[in-house]
A protein has these predicted regions:
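Beta-strand-enriched cores of mature, soluble protein domains
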Residues: 27-163
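Secretory targeting and sorting signals
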Residues: 2-27
Length: 163
């Protein structure tokens, strides 16, 4: 090896050491990116005090997803003109590679007809994740409905995610 190459190699060691030390810091402080999910499927009352959701859809950063959700802990909502339900709404989104995100919303779902309940501008947070989303965090807004007449639901989540 020539003397110039040896000197260049030694001179580059501090740079390599700096990059190796900084890399975990950069990965741990992920920048929030847009997060959007559109899901739909079947749903209805599982018991008088719980609702289920089961479906699929598409999500930015996740791709195609399957969805399993519940709404529980019902109490009457006084903020809806036609009545509504305060509830704990949880959705488990599973990506094709098996990675998951659990989204939680303490929301108010308002009756908009005798058979349709709607959640508009309901805040959510990303509670947990697995696989490539193991350390994910994020927040945003849920908009969705459950139509009891035909047992269907549809919803969107829009916000940000860091992982």
């Amino acid at each position: 090896m020539s003397r110039k190459l040896r000197i260049a190699g030694v001179a580059g060691l501090p740079l390599v050491a700096t990059l190796l030390v900084a890399a975990p810091t950069v990965a741990a402080s992920a920048t929030p990116v847009p997060f959007f999910v559109s899901i739909s499927g079947v749903g209805g009352f599982a018991t008088p005090s719980s609702v289920y959701f089961q479906g699929s859809g598409i999500a930015l950063v996740m791709g195609k997803v399957t969805d399993a959700g519940t709404a529980t802990d019902f109490t009457p909502a006084t903020t809806c003109s036609a009545g509504g339900i305060n509830n704990l709404h949880t959705e488990l989104l599973t990506a094709a590679d098996g990675s998951t995100l659990t989204i939680v919303s303490h929301d108010v779902a308002c009756w908009v007809s005798a058979t349709r309940i709607y959640c508009a501008h309901c805040p959510y947070s990303i509670d947990t994740g697995t696989g490539r989303f193991a350390n994910a965090t994020g927040t945003g807004e849920l908009n969705g409905y459950l139509e009891l007449a035909n047992g269907t639901f549809a919803g969107t989540y829009s916000g940000t995610i860091s992982f």
